[in-house]
Design a protein with these regions (language model features):
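Conserved acidic
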Residues: 1-473
Length: 473
């Protein structure tokens, strides 16, 4: 990943930005999902299945390689999700070359879903040191496009994706009956979605509703239950029952009237109850499949990757090196710059941290026609701040030439305690935060624990050796 990169136009370079088409619906459609009750294997069990046969979740200790530019396994520390090659460097957010030679200092211990940990061990040289626990399920199911046999969640996805496609209207090029028939056959062949041609008409409201159903459905499986709850109490006895209940922690009492009291309480973790819709395994598998899908695309571009988000990749396109393939089906990649600007390519890319980046686009491929886009989480760019939130200011912060900026946010709508909504003036500090990878010269970054000599560091090393020789003379 790059903190800053400028495309070399003389060499034919471009910066391309692509996004996965309906990432989570696509993994709900095609991903393998476990079913049944798990058989739990504990450490030392000789009957434990081999790594290629795992299908559930695994608690293990692994040592990452030291030369993997794009790590596979996530590791949470300091309230952040890192992708490190060294645990100690990630926990301290080290900015220097890793010096931890002892595997005990570098190893990661955690719980991962089977698709992710199998990718790490079988394809990316992670060393499996110890398996503490394996949840092995009865089997896996997935959608079969040839037989149209549904998997665990594919029937739901096909239903609402058909509604979304129909509410989007016919795509460009479907001007004849033959073109429409070919389009419907193509969607059925690759996505298993049956389109009713009599219902294909633009309906923005229905499209938005079906999109919401597709993207939010799987989240119900992982809904958090250990959160505050509010009740209204009308007599002293009810209040005392709530206060002395060992399963509840009363957090707030708010008198609403002489006869009514609003009580906010939180369940004790040991007494947490599962919801009828909860299935933590399937929520975890959905995000896992999404990360693996994105990783496959990142792996194709390697160190040409400039930036990645949950479902998007920015990378350097060079003559003679393969570009990421584009498509229109679920899980394929779409050209994000082309969708926003038409035929265009990015010239510069700046990364200030997660959801904090900017890029310049040559519209129509003409460097004289440049448009600038800046995305900053928590800041809506309008007339009140567009003179501060600029490409030049972001570049200055990325290059360490200026301090963080305070951005005014006038008339922000905010919720405050007591169920009140207010409008107030506030501000946000805009700053660069690159703490999940180690910054090296020229704007490049590498994972924490990456020890393979990088060209810029090698040049620095050679310069230091030459200076040392001169001083010794």
């Amino acid at each position: 990943m790059k903190a800053y990169y400028k495309a070399d136009l003389e060499k034919g370079e471009k910066i391309k930005m692509v996004g996965v088409v309906s990432e989570y619906p696509s993994v709900n459609l095609r991903g393998k999902y476990s079913y049944g009750h798990p058989h739990i294997f504990l450490e030392g069990d000789n009957t434990m299945p081999d790594v290629p046969d795992w299908n559930g979740v695994v608690k293990a200790t692994l040592v990452p390689p030291t030369d993997l530019y794009l790590p596979v396994l996530p590791y949470k520390c300091g309230g952040k999700l890192h992708f490190p090659l060294c645990r100690s460097c990630a926990e301290t957010e080290s900015r220097v070359l890793c010096s931890h030679d002892d595997p005990e200092d570098r190893q990661l211990k955690g719980v991962w879903c089977a698709p992710e940990i199998k990718l790490a061990i079988l394809e990316k040289s992670y060393e499996l040191r110890q398996v503490h626990e394996v949840y092995q399920y009865q089997g896996e199911v997935s959608f079969n496009p040839e037989t149209q046999q549904d998997g665990l969640l594919s029937g739901y996805v096909r239903c609402f994706m058909a509604l979304k496609i129909q509410a989007s209207g016919w795509p460009e090029g479907c001007d004849s009956e033959k073109a429409k028939e070919d389009y419907m056959a193509d969607v059925l062949k690759y996505d298993g979605i049956i389109i009713d041609p009599t219902k294909v008409t633009k309906n923005p409201a229905l499209r938005q509703l079906s999109k919401l159903m597709l993207n939010s459905f799987w989240g119900e499986f992982g809904e958090k239950t250990l959160r505050p709850k509010t009740e209204f109490v009308y007599n002293y006895g009810e209040l005392m029952q709530m206060i002395i209940d060992p399963r509840k922690i009363v957090q707030n009492l708010l008198p609403l009237s002489d006869a009514c009291l609003q009580v906010t309480w939180k369940p004790v973790s040991d007494s947490e109850e599962s919801l009828p819709t909860s299935s933590l395994l399937h929520a975890a598998l959905t995000t896992c499949h999404g990360r693996v899908q994105l990783y496959r695309y990142l792996d194709l571009v390697g160190d040409r990757a400039v930036y990645c988000d949950t479902d998007s990749v920015a990378y350097i396109s060079r003559p003679g090196e393969p570009d990421l393939p584009l498509g229109t089906h679920l899980g394929d990649l779409s050209d994000q710059i082309g969708e926003d600007f038409g035929p265009a390519s990015s010239l510069n890319f700046l990364l200030g941290g997660p959801k904090n980046y900017g890029f310049k686009v040559a519209v129509g491929g003409d460097p004289a026609k440049v448009k600038v886009t800046i995305k900053v989480r928590g800041i809506t760019i309008n007339k009140s701040c567009d003179h501060l939130v600029t490409f030049d200011n972001l570049k200055a912060m990325v290059m360490g030439e200026t301090d963080p900026l305070t951005i005014p946010i006038p008339r922000q709508i905010a919720r405050i305690p007591g169920w009140r909504v207010v409008t107030r003036d506030t501000s946000k500090v805009w700053q660069v935060k690159n703490t999940k990878r180690r910054r090296i010269s020229r704007g490049d970054t590498v994972p924490h624990g990456y020890n393979k000599w990088y060209m810029a560091e090698q040049q620095d090393h050679e310069i230091l050796e030459e200076l040392d020789t001169l001083f010794n003379e």
